[in-house]
């Protein structure tokens, strides 16, 4: 890893034939600004962990990224603790199956627009937004979760979230919801009345430390497959 790298100019790079950019800047912990608007990502299949642990990265311009061939995106921004906002409006995620750790530990992220995200092929969303401590609202109304199997710790540690609408989530195939909303300390109410939990085996710590939650509708929860409820409302 190039942990001492503070600036880098890649404006002359021709990336038109590149198929993988996984871990490209992983551990570049001294980088503060990065402009990749000239990058051609039309053939790229993997962006996994691309900016992982770029802990001081405050400005990242990837607004021009077009990703029609993208298959792997897990952990792309994991550990980008200084990023405040991200523009992913041009991302094509229609072929991606694993969204795990995507924004994990993006502690300073205040704005995130994912309305254009296609998650129809997704099967995993483990730790997807874990420890996004500055996010206050998150619109996931466009998410297709019909194939998702694991949602464990998806919103774990999103301590500033005051509004979260996941009422449209299709959870019919989900088996693991452990820690899903753990430490969402600012949430006061949550509508999960449409959740299909018939296949869920693990709900441990699901609402653990949701200290502001005053209203929770779980009347339609099917707990017949559950084997672990430890710490569920702790």
Predicted regions and their residues:
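Negatively charged
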Residues: 1-234
């Amino acid at each position: 890893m190039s942990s001492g790298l503070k600036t880098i100019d890649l404006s002359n790079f021709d990336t038109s034939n590149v198929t993988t950019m996984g871990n490209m800047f992983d551990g570049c912990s001294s980088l503060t600004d990065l402009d990749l608007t000239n990058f051609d990502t039309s053939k790229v299949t993997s962006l996994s962990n691309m900016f992982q642990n770029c802990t001081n990265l405050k400005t990242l311009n990837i607004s021009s990224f077009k990703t029609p061939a993208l298959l792997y995106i897990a952990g792309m921004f994991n550990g980008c603790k200084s990023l405040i906002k991200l523009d992913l409006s041009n991302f094509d995620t229609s072929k991606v199956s694993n969204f795990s750790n995507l924004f994990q530990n993006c502690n300073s992220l205040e704005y995130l627009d994912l309305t254009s995200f296609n998650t129809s092929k997704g099967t995993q969303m483990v730790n997807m937004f874990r420890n996004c401590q500055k996010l206050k609202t998150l619109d996931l109304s466009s998410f297709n979760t019909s194939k998702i199997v694991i949602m464990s710790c998806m919103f774990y540690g999103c301590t500033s979230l005051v509004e979260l609408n996941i009422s449209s989530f299709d959870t019919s195939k989900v088996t693991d919801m452990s820690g899903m909303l753990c430490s969402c300390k600012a949430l006061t109410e949550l509508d999960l009345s449409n959740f299909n939990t018939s296949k869920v085996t693990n709900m441990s710590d699901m609402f653990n430390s949701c200290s502001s939650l005053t209203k929770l509708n779980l009347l339609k929860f099917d707990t017949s497959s559950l084997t672990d409820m430890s710490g569920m409302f702790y």
